[in-house]
C-alpha cells in the first residue's frame, strides 16, 4: 500500500490524514476512510456491494484508446505515462476530483482503489505523482 501524508488544519489543531493506494481485492479496513475507484472499468469479479466504493472516478482514468493501445503493446509504458499525464493536465474534470479529495481529507483518510496486479506498470504511478503535485505534497 502506498501512502501520501497531508496535514489538514482545523480550528482545534492539526489533524493528519492520508491518501492511501490499495488494490481493489485487498481487505477493506476502517483506516481506508473514503474509498475512490480510480479505474475506468469495474474490477473483474468484484461485487459492487463488497467493494465499498464511495466514489467511482472514471473521469480521471486513462482514455479507452490510450488504455487499449498500452495493453495491446502499441505503445510502451514511457509513452503511455507521457500521454496519460497530458490527458490529466487537459482534463477539465480533475478540479472536481481534487475538490472531492480535499473535502474528504478534512474528515479522514482517502483510499485510491485500483485493480491492477502490477500498479507500478499501470496508470497509478502517474496519477499518484500528479495528485501529489496538484495537492502540494
Write out the residue ranges for each language-model feature:
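Short hydrophobic targeting helices and cationic amphipathic motifs
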Residues: 3, 7-9
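Residues lining hydrophobic/aromatic ligand-binding pockets adjacent to catalytic sites
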Residues: 9-137
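Accessible peptide chain termini
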Residues: 1-2, 15
Amino acid at each position: 500500500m502506498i501512502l501520501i501524508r497531508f496535514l489538514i488544519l482545523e480550528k482545534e489543531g492539526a489533524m493528519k490524514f492520508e491518501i492511501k493506494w490499495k488494490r481493489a481485492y485487498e481487505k477493506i479496513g476502517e483506516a481506508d476512510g473514503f474509498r475512490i475507484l480510480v479505474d475506468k472499468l469495474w474490477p473483474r469479479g468484484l461485487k459492487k456491494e463488497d467493494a465499498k466504493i464511495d466514489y467511482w472516478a472514471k473521469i480521471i482514468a486513462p482514455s479507452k484508446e490510450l488504455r487499449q493501445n498500452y495493453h495491446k503493446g502499441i505503445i510502451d509504458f514511457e509513452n503511455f505515462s507521457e500521454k496519460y499525464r497530458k490527458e490529466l493536465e487537459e482534463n477539465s474534470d480533475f478540479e472536481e476530483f481534487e475538490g472531492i479529495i480535499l473535502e474528504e481529507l478534512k474528515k479522514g483518510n482517502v483510499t485510491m482503489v485500483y485493480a491492477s496486479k502490477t500498479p507500478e506498470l499501470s496508470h497509478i504511478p502517474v496519477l499518484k505523482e500528479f495528485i501529489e503535485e496538484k495537492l502540494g505534497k
